[in-house]
Amino acid sequence: MRECISIHVGQAGVQIGNACWELYCLEHGIQPDGQMPSDKTIGGGDDSFNTFFSETGAGKHVPRAVFVDLEPTVIDEVRTGTYRQLFHPEQLITGKEDAANNYARGHYTIGKEIIDLVLDRIRKLADQCTGLQGFLVFHSFGGGTGSGFTSLLMERLSVDYGKKSKLEFSIYPAPQVSTAVVEPYNSILTTHTTLEHSDCAFMVDNEAIYDICRRNLDIERPTYTNLNRLISQIVSSITASLRFDGALNVDLTEFQTNLVPYPRIHFPLATYAPVISAEKAYHEQLTVAEITNACFEPANQMVKCDPRHGKYMACCLLYRGDVVPKDVNAAIATIKTKRTIQFVDWCPTGFKVGINYQPPTVVPGGDLARVQRAVCMLSNTTAIAEAWARLDHKFDLMYAKRAFVHWYVGEGMEEGEFSEAREDMAALEKDYEEVGADSAEGDDEGEEY
């Protein structure tokens, strides 16, 4: 089997974890107590879901997941919530005092007290796997635990499980709204530390998701639950190929092979369609062509940036539901002719496609309409450098005045780490710039496509 272990770090990671496991349980017909009623077993003997769940002798299905937070309140909600019986108590690990939005606390002082316990738990999960494929790490960039503890964990996972792939789902600080003043510091420190340990990082920015909820789902004031449910649909689409059997199946390592041209350039942009409320879905057809086209609308992306200003290096389309290859090929052909999609000149227009016959599941009482088919597009585009540039600019404004730096130094960091991290980010921006630059000396013949 190709098992995956999910690790949810900090408040954002844990709350997205709740939404994801809720959805997985619905998709696989697993009840909140971990039982799978025999009449619900889809198609009988389909055990692909064992990549995400392990089965006990008593027929209970336990998620292969660890929830970690340096303070107890968020995970206490899991301990008392609907799914309290789903998780093994030792999978929910909490500390006593939080990281206070401080990378240094998550990475050095508070984080190191709990790291061995976490690794021990992960080791137990890994030992239950026959062929561990890799780790999915969920966290935010802005928080102290999400940034500091995650980067510590990634370093240690690289040591313990060197060759296993590590994928991140990261909540990137939104351009306009912020939950902490020091987000730019934490984000840049964590990106710098994690860059060499992560194989692929799917970024999601809250503001982009807010806008999608407002615009497509007509939710006037989206809550984190609304956001997380939408994020969980995307995560579910990305992992569906590991959990169900399909026509064109894609596994974790296959993503990286197709999406990551250079080790450092591993930040694909996720786009999901159709995001539509039940009232609207009733009046629309949502053909394969339509949803494929929607993926190339900047409005449907999970990070605010404009791919029309950048170039694509790779593109993965993951369909699920009632989709046949003929429709997909037609849709892609149309897009190639109509859209102004620029690929870098060293990469011929390659679209990788995955198809899963399991239609998207919706959470009862959720915001999304039940649809026949959906698509999640993962594209590696140079446009995401805009997001880095935005963050770097904010970092520079604060760091020029050395604002808030004493909190980090007080927890045992050195000021040199800031400048080192910032230089690494500058190098990353430069990498993106160079990848997008034409390999030929002439710049004028690039306009034809």
Curated annotation (Swiss-Prot):
The modification Phosphotyrosine is found at Y432. InterPro entries: Alpha_tubulin, Tub_FtsZ_C, Tubulin, Tubulin/FtsZ-like_C, Tubulin/FtsZ_2-layer-sand-dom, Tubulin/FtsZ_GTPase_sf, Tubulin_C, Tubulin_CS. Pfam families: Tubulin, Tubulin_C. Its cofactor is Mg(2+). A motif (MREC motif) lies at residues 1-4. The modification N6-acetyllysine is found at K40. One of its GO terms (molecular function) is GTP binding. The modification Phosphoserine is found at S439. It is found in: Cytoplasm, Cytoskeleton. Keywords: Acetylation, Cytoplasm, Cytoskeleton, GTP-binding, Hydrolase, Magnesium, Metal-binding, Methylation, Microtubule, Nitration, Nucleotide-binding, Phosphoprotein. The keyword Transmembrane does not apply. CDD domains: alpha_tubulin. GTP binds at Q11, E71, S140, G144, T145, T179, N206, N228. It comes from the Eukaryota. It catalyses: GTP + H2O = GDP + phosphate + H(+). The active site is at E254. The record marks Y449 as: Involved in polymerization. GO terms for cellular component: cytoplasm; cytoplasmic microtubule; membrane raft; microtubule; nucleus. The keyword Thylakoid does not apply. Tubulin is the major constituent of microtubules, a cylinder consisting of laterally associated linear protofilaments composed of alpha- and beta-tubulin heterodimers. Microtubules grow by the addition of GTP-tubulin dimers to the microtubule end, where a stabilizing cap forms. Below the cap, tubulin dimers are in GDP-bound state, owing to GTPase activity of alpha-tubulin. The MREC motif may be critical for tubulin autoregulation. Belongs to the tubulin family. This is Tubulin alpha-1C chain. It comes from Rattus norvegicus. The gene is Tuba1c.
